[in-house]
């Protein structure tokens, strides 16, 4: 019998893994927020610093311009056609980032595959310079491997 996957644990592991990847790349501390986004009260009025901490999936260093949304989903997405799942993730990332005046940065861990990074196209000034590997455009978002983005 196939073992049931605990989605909460899988998401927590992905967030920890992503925090380690970003910490290593930037040499600055990144950490899990520790409260699932579903449990974060959107209606509660938080002060600016608390809102900065609890809005994203990761606590980012001071001055980091991105709001990091982390997903761990075992589904591939066809970037040539509309994807309700990807649209849902992008809306959440964009809404959260807008609420704290940051740039949305979606990182998607695929089961037994690498990480995918998704950023708004308007913030990618020169795709030829930034992305040395394969990238794609989905609506107004640039999609590439996280490894390619972080170099």
Placement of each model-derived feature along the sequence:
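Catalytic phosphate/metal-binding cores of nucleic-acid and nucleotide-processing enzymes, i.e., regions
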Residues: 1-151
